[in-house]
Amino acid sequence: MARSSGPLCLLLLGGLVAGILSGASADGNGLPSKKLKMQYTAGPLLKFQICVSUGYRRVFEDYMRVISQRYPDIRIEGENYLPHPIYRNIASFLSVFKLVLIGLIIAGKDPFAFFGMQAPSVWQWGQENKVYACMMVFFVSNMIENQCMSTGAFEITLNDVPVWSKLESGHLPSVQQLVQIIDNEMKLNVHMDAIPHHHRS
Protein backbone atom coordinates (compact mmCIF):
# COMPACT_ATOMS: atom_id res chain seq x y z
CA MET A 1 0.00 0.00 0.00
CA ALA A 2 2.82 2.40 0.94
CA ARG A 3 4.70 1.57 -2.28
CA SER A 4 1.65 2.19 -4.47
CA SER A 5 1.18 5.61 -2.92
CA GLY A 6 4.69 6.67 -3.98
CA PRO A 7 3.88 7.76 -7.57
CA LEU A 8 0.76 9.53 -6.37
CA CYS A 9 2.77 11.43 -3.77
CA LEU A 10 5.35 12.41 -6.39
CA LEU A 11 2.57 13.67 -8.66
CA LEU A 12 1.08 15.61 -5.77
CA LEU A 13 4.45 17.14 -4.89
CA GLY A 14 5.01 18.13 -8.51
CA GLY A 15 1.68 19.93 -8.59
CA LEU A 16 2.37 21.70 -5.31
CA VAL A 17 5.80 22.87 -6.45
CA ALA A 18 4.38 24.12 -9.76
CA GLY A 19 1.69 26.06 -7.94
CA ILE A 20 4.18 27.62 -5.55
CA LEU A 21 6.60 28.58 -8.32
CA SER A 22 3.82 30.12 -10.40
CA GLY A 23 2.73 32.16 -7.39
CA ALA A 24 6.28 33.19 -6.65
CA SER A 25 6.80 34.40 -10.20
CA ALA A 26 4.48 37.32 -9.51
CA ASP A 27 6.97 38.67 -7.02
CA GLY A 28 10.49 37.62 -6.14
CA ASN A 29 9.54 36.68 -2.57
CA GLY A 30 6.58 34.53 -3.48
CA LEU A 31 4.24 37.38 -2.59
CA PRO A 32 1.34 38.59 -4.69
CA SER A 33 2.35 41.06 -7.34
CA LYS A 34 3.10 44.26 -5.48
CA LYS A 35 2.19 46.71 -8.22
CA LEU A 36 -1.48 46.35 -9.04
CA LYS A 37 -2.29 49.19 -11.38
CA MET A 38 -0.94 52.52 -12.50
CA GLN A 39 -2.44 55.08 -14.82
CA TYR A 40 0.15 57.30 -16.47
CA THR A 41 -1.59 60.66 -16.60
CA ALA A 42 -0.58 64.07 -15.36
CA GLY A 43 -2.31 65.10 -12.17
CA PRO A 44 -2.67 64.28 -8.47
CA LEU A 45 -1.55 60.84 -7.26
CA LEU A 46 -4.08 58.66 -5.44
CA LYS A 47 -2.28 55.71 -3.89
CA PHE A 48 -3.83 52.55 -2.42
CA GLN A 49 -1.91 50.20 -0.13
CA ILE A 50 -4.08 47.15 0.40
CA CYS A 51 -4.04 43.63 1.80
CA VAL A 52 -4.15 41.53 -1.37
CA SER A 53 -4.48 38.24 0.54
CA UNK A 54 -7.59 39.65 2.27
CA GLY A 55 -9.42 39.82 -1.06
CA TYR A 56 -9.31 43.62 -1.36
CA ARG A 57 -7.92 43.63 -4.88
CA ARG A 58 -11.43 43.46 -6.38
CA VAL A 59 -12.54 46.35 -4.15
CA PHE A 60 -9.53 48.38 -5.30
CA GLU A 61 -10.35 47.71 -8.96
CA ASP A 62 -13.99 48.77 -8.44
CA TYR A 63 -12.93 52.00 -6.71
CA MET A 64 -10.33 52.67 -9.39
CA ARG A 65 -12.92 52.32 -12.13
CA VAL A 66 -15.31 54.79 -10.48
CA ILE A 67 -12.59 57.31 -9.63
CA SER A 68 -11.04 57.13 -13.09
CA GLN A 69 -14.39 58.00 -14.66
CA ARG A 70 -15.04 60.87 -12.26
CA TYR A 71 -11.48 62.22 -12.10
CA PRO A 72 -9.73 61.38 -15.38
CA ASP A 73 -6.68 63.50 -14.45
CA ILE A 74 -5.91 61.59 -11.26
CA ARG A 75 -3.12 59.02 -11.34
CA ILE A 76 -3.99 55.86 -9.44
CA GLU A 77 -1.48 53.43 -7.96
CA GLY A 78 -2.08 50.29 -5.96
CA GLU A 79 0.33 48.03 -4.14
CA ASN A 80 0.32 45.25 -1.59
CA TYR A 81 0.60 46.46 2.01
CA LEU A 82 3.34 44.24 3.37
CA PRO A 83 3.20 42.97 6.96
CA HIS A 84 5.94 43.33 9.56
CA PRO A 85 9.25 41.74 8.44
CA ILE A 86 8.97 39.13 11.21
CA TYR A 87 5.72 37.80 9.77
CA ARG A 88 7.11 37.92 6.23
CA ASN A 89 10.12 35.88 7.37
CA ILE A 90 7.88 33.33 9.07
CA ALA A 91 5.82 32.97 5.89
CA SER A 92 8.97 32.61 3.77
CA PHE A 93 10.37 29.98 6.13
CA LEU A 94 7.15 27.97 6.09
CA SER A 95 6.98 28.07 2.28
CA VAL A 96 10.36 26.30 2.16
CA PHE A 97 9.92 24.11 5.24
CA LYS A 98 6.69 22.55 3.98
CA LEU A 99 8.43 21.42 0.77
CA VAL A 100 11.28 19.88 2.76
CA LEU A 101 8.83 18.12 5.05
CA ILE A 102 6.75 16.82 2.14
CA GLY A 103 9.94 15.58 0.48
CA LEU A 104 10.94 13.70 3.64
CA ILE A 105 7.49 12.14 3.90
CA ILE A 106 7.57 10.96 0.28
CA ALA A 107 11.15 9.67 0.54
CA GLY A 108 10.36 7.87 3.78
CA LYS A 109 13.33 9.45 5.54
CA ASP A 110 13.16 9.76 9.31
CA PRO A 111 14.65 13.15 10.35
CA PHE A 112 14.34 12.23 14.03
CA ALA A 113 16.82 9.37 13.64
CA PHE A 114 19.46 11.92 12.58
CA PHE A 115 19.19 13.51 16.04
CA GLY A 116 19.06 10.15 17.80
CA MET A 117 15.40 10.59 18.68
CA GLN A 118 12.50 8.21 18.37
CA ALA A 119 9.97 9.19 15.70
CA PRO A 120 6.64 10.30 17.21
CA SER A 121 3.45 8.48 16.37
CA VAL A 122 2.29 11.30 14.07
CA TRP A 123 5.35 10.74 11.87
CA GLN A 124 4.65 7.01 11.71
CA TRP A 125 1.06 7.81 10.75
CA GLY A 126 2.36 10.11 8.01
CA GLN A 127 4.51 7.31 6.59
CA GLU A 128 1.50 5.02 6.47
CA ASN A 129 -0.73 7.70 4.92
CA LYS A 130 1.63 9.70 2.73
CA VAL A 131 -0.97 11.32 0.49
CA TYR A 132 -3.06 12.61 3.40
CA ALA A 133 0.04 13.67 5.31
CA CYS A 134 1.39 15.67 2.35
CA MET A 135 -1.96 17.38 1.83
CA MET A 136 -2.27 18.18 5.52
CA VAL A 137 1.23 19.69 5.69
CA PHE A 138 0.58 21.76 2.57
CA PHE A 139 -2.81 23.18 3.57
CA VAL A 140 -1.95 23.81 7.24
CA SER A 141 1.24 25.59 6.21
CA ASN A 142 -0.65 27.65 3.62
CA MET A 143 -3.21 28.65 6.23
CA ILE A 144 -0.49 29.89 8.59
CA GLU A 145 1.34 31.67 5.75
CA ASN A 146 -1.84 33.49 4.71
CA GLN A 147 -2.47 34.47 8.31
CA CYS A 148 1.05 35.91 8.56
CA MET A 149 0.66 37.87 5.31
CA SER A 150 -2.85 39.20 6.04
CA THR A 151 -2.68 42.75 7.38
CA GLY A 152 -6.28 43.85 6.81
CA ALA A 153 -4.94 47.11 5.42
CA PHE A 154 -6.72 49.40 2.99
CA GLU A 155 -4.75 52.63 3.21
CA ILE A 156 -5.34 55.56 0.85
CA THR A 157 -3.21 58.66 0.31
CA LEU A 158 -3.68 61.62 -2.03
CA ASN A 159 -0.37 63.24 -2.97
CA ASP A 160 1.21 61.41 -0.01
CA VAL A 161 -1.38 62.84 2.41
CA PRO A 162 -3.33 60.09 4.26
CA VAL A 163 -7.05 60.34 3.51
CA TRP A 164 -8.26 56.93 4.74
CA SER A 165 -6.91 54.11 6.90
CA LYS A 166 -8.80 50.88 7.51
CA LEU A 167 -6.23 49.98 10.16
CA GLU A 168 -7.41 53.03 12.14
CA SER A 169 -11.11 53.18 11.20
CA GLY A 170 -11.72 49.43 11.16
CA HIS A 171 -13.77 49.46 7.96
CA LEU A 172 -13.57 50.21 4.25
CA PRO A 173 -14.83 53.53 2.90
CA SER A 174 -17.90 53.52 0.73
CA VAL A 175 -17.58 54.83 -2.81
CA GLN A 176 -19.56 57.92 -1.78
CA GLN A 177 -17.25 58.55 1.17
CA LEU A 178 -14.16 58.21 -0.98
CA VAL A 179 -15.52 60.52 -3.67
CA GLN A 180 -16.45 63.10 -1.01
CA ILE A 181 -12.97 62.90 0.51
CA ILE A 182 -11.32 63.39 -2.87
CA ASP A 183 -13.67 66.29 -3.67
CA ASN A 184 -12.78 68.01 -0.40
CA GLU A 185 -9.06 67.47 -0.88
CA MET A 186 -9.16 68.72 -4.46
CA LYS A 187 -11.11 71.85 -3.44
CA LEU A 188 -8.64 72.47 -0.61
CA ASN A 189 -5.70 72.18 -2.98
CA VAL A 190 -7.31 74.58 -5.44
CA HIS A 191 -7.98 77.03 -2.60
CA MET A 192 -4.39 76.81 -1.35
CA ASP A 193 -3.06 77.37 -4.87
CA ALA A 194 -5.27 80.44 -5.24
CA ILE A 195 -3.81 82.10 -2.12
CA PRO A 196 -1.25 84.73 -3.23
CA HIS A 197 2.26 84.11 -1.98
CA HIS A 198 4.08 87.23 -0.79
CA HIS A 199 7.83 87.17 -1.25
CA ARG A 200 10.08 89.28 0.79
CA SER A 201 12.16 91.69 -1.33
Curated annotation (Swiss-Prot):
Catalysed reactions listed for this entry: [thioredoxin]-dithiol + NADP(+) = [thioredoxin]-disulfide + NADPH + H(+)
Location in the cell: Endoplasmic reticulum membrane
Keyword RNA-binding: no
EC number: 1.8.1.9
Main location: endoplasmic reticulum
One GO BP: cellular oxidant detoxification
GO CC field: endoplasmic reticulum; endoplasmic reticulum membrane
Pfam assignment, any one: Rdx
InterPro entries for this protein: Selenoprotein_Rdx-typ (IPR011893), Selenoprotein_T (IPR019389), Thioredoxin-like_sf (IPR036249)
Post-translational modification summary for this protein: May contain a selenide-sulfide bond between Cys-51 and Sec-54. This bond is speculated to serve as redox-active pair.
Residue intervals passing through the bilayer: 96-116
Keywords: Endoplasmic reticulum, Membrane, NADP, Oxidoreductase, Redox-active center, Selenocysteine, Signal, Transmembrane, Transmembrane helix
GO MF: thioredoxin-disulfide reductase (NADPH) activity
Crosslink feature (Cysteinyl-selenocysteine (Cys-Sec)) location: 51-54
Extent of the signal sequence: 1-26
Described purpose of this protein according to its UniProt entry: Selenoprotein with thioredoxin reductase-like oxidoreductase activity.
Family stated for the protein in its record: Belongs to the SelWTH family. Selenoprotein T subfamily.
Name of protein: Thioredoxin reductase-like selenoprotein T
Protein source organism: Xenopus tropicalis (Western clawed frog)
